[in-house]
Curated annotation (Swiss-Prot):
Binding site for substrate: 64, 115, 159, 166, 190, 242, 260
Superkingdom, taxonomy of origin: Bacteria
UniProt entry keywords in alphabetical sequence: Hydrolase
Self-association and partners: Homotetramer.
Protein name stated in the entry: Glutaminase
Keyword Hydrolase found: yes
GO biological process, one term: glutamine catabolic process
Name of the gene this protein is made from: glsA
Record EC number: 3.5.1.2
One Pfam family matching this protein: Glutaminase
Membership in a protein family: Belongs to the glutaminase family.
Amino acid sequence: MKPTKQILEDILNEVRPLIGQGEVADYIPALACVPSNKLGIAVYTNDGEMITAGDANERFSIQSISKALSLTLAMELYQPEELWHRVGKEPSGQAFNSLIQLEMEQGVPRNPFINAGAIVVADMLFSRFSAPKHRLLEFVRKLSGNEHIIYDRVVANSEMDHSDRNASIAYLMRSFGNFENEVMPVLKNYFHACSLNMSCVDLAKTFGYLANKGIQPETNEFIITPMQSKQINALMATCGLYDGAGEFAYRVGMPGKSGVGGGIIAIVPGEMTIAVWSPELDPSGNSLAGTQALELLSERIGRSIF
């Protein structure tokens, strides 16, 4: 079955009672101010159809969803052996900001979707781009077709003001020789990436290339190779939802990437992208109502990679 607006609206009505059962990300003060009753979903098909319901056009801080976009840029710039020498491809089973595993594994992060891995990727982009912050924003605007996407400076500054743990992660990796640049400028770029302000509609369009073998559906532009698209989807399926990745694969059955702003992007390879947003999170840091909405949609339209 194809997704329809009615299906999306019905699903949002079914998951709305979950609002009030999760927690917004209060460790980033600027995110704690977001109204917890927001709920939106957008589906973007490979033939260019956009189907939405709820607050699908309202922008929010995408946070760790940006890690998949930064990884895409890094895969364009670096040979595989260079990239995967510095960051792994395995699930961590730990909290996304854990230091324990990083110490035990000699400063090489398990995957690019935990904080340590994304900070390594940010360091790699910093080494190759004279202005990585501007390059990422340009890339996202091109993919989404929306020139009005911006960084939320309030969120970025809030994260910078509470950066002790991420700075510790970066300095620990530096002590093992897995960091090339000064820590704080790299972290500033990393926090700006997390602060990208986008809607479900923006996200669904932006990630279209991962549902279309590396080609952006609307423009037919080559972004990455089919092999690279497969690899990013595989990492999203195994590592994209922190230590809740297995639960998400079991319930939803799609590659996905979440952020503590309450957004999740999910991919149905060869068919569509799905973006959901609900700010309240489960204990793993994933959107509570958003995950349930994706599970219901997977069941209703009969889509899963498994």
